[in-house]
Amino acid sequence: MTPDDLLEEFRAAGALLEGHFILSSGLHSAVFLQKMAIFSDPVRTARVCAGLASVIRDRYGAVDLVVSPAIGGIVPGYETARALGARAIFVERDPGGPFQLRRGFSIPAGSRAVMVEDIVTTGLSSRECLAALRDQPGEVVGAACLIDRSGGRADLGAPLVALATLDIPNYPADQLPPDLAAIPAVKPGSRATTPG
């Protein structure tokens, strides 16, 4: 699957939205990628995650585990793991706390794991997920995502491979361009932020 193929999947699913959006990072953007419109379709999800699995194999080789941040990363993590023939586990947080492996999940010594995200904007969730894995005995070889909307600038502290890399401008609330500021903002994402 090429980056253009992935974007066509988003368009066909009605998941490539234009307007004024407050992202889960708190930044504002004229473009929102509504990944749940992709993930609500099992066939489409399997197709895009198989594409990501191919990119992971090319970059990192064989992996035993896919680790994703809950909640948004669980579906693409699971489907990507299935395409890789790997196990899927996830990190989650107690309210207000850091991500951690729970439910008996671990990265055993000798295993190779990749962290899989859906969409990377600033890389915050990915960095937090990777931090939760640092003390595991197995090796975390890197990270992967369907779309890196930072244009390749997000620093995860680990290698990142994306099925598509886009350079979509994002703005702090106090630095909006006039055309974006003229449109009422909506918050379609999952992480609570204060509109501004």
UniProtKB/Swiss-Prot annotation:
Orotate binds at residues 121, 149. Pathway: Pyrimidine metabolism; UMP biosynthesis via de novo pathway; UMP from orotate: step 1/2. GO terms for molecular function: magnesium ion binding; orotate phosphoribosyltransferase activity. The keyword Glycosyltransferase applies. Its EC number is 2.4.2.10. It catalyses: orotidine 5'-phosphate + diphosphate = orotate + 5-phospho-alpha-D-ribose 1-diphosphate. Homodimer. Belongs to the purine/pyrimidine phosphoribosyltransferase family. PyrE subfamily. This is Orotate phosphoribosyltransferase. It comes from Methylobacterium sp. (strain 4-46).
